[in-house]
A protein has these predicted regions:
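Boundary regions of SH3-family modules and the immediately adjacent low-complexity/disordered segments
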Residues: 13-14, 21, 28-34, 42-81, ...
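Short N-terminal segments immediately surrounding and downstream of signal-peptide cleavage
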Residues: 1-9
Length: 132
């Protein structure tokens, strides 16, 4: 995920034209390949690809809710009680993921929320990815 503001470029050099300017700390990007301090990445929401400097990425994992009408955040233990209804495009921190669900964390109106969302409703994590 991005540490902060970042430019997506057509080539792996600061002289290359800028495709898009990201201004979202924690925005998840899919890393397709790396070379000499640069990463060729794909935006998981719209599929745009380009180059970014490697130092612009943090080791923290974030997700974005997909453009379904909304996603549900479920209770931590039973995954059957709805705790929160999430609009499309909500950024959340990933705590961990099992084979089908991701445990997410976010703050809403000064309240810390901890809940589960099905992977199929998230950008920023692969369907077969396990995160501990």
């Amino acid at each position: 995920s991005l540490k902060g503001d970042a430019n997506l470029r057509y080539g792996p050099t600061t002289d290359a034209n800028i495709i898009y300017r990201y201004q979202h700390k924690g925005y998840p990007m899919e890393i397709l390949r790396e070379t000499d301090g640069w990463r060729y990445v794909k935006d998981p929401q719209d599929g745009v690809e380009g180059w970014m400097r490697s130092f612009l990425f943090s080791g923290k994992r974030y997700a974005i809710t997909k453009s379904e009408p909304f996603s549900y955040g479920y209770d931590n233990t039973k995954k059957n009680q709805i705790l929160v209804k999430l609009d499309p495009g909500v950024h959340t921190s990933i705590k961990n993921c099992d084979s089908k669900w991701c445990r997410l964390k976010m703050t809403l109106e000064d309240e810390e929320l901890d809940f589960w969302v099905e992977k199929k409703n998230l950008f920023g994590v692969y369907s077969n990815e396990i995160i501990n």
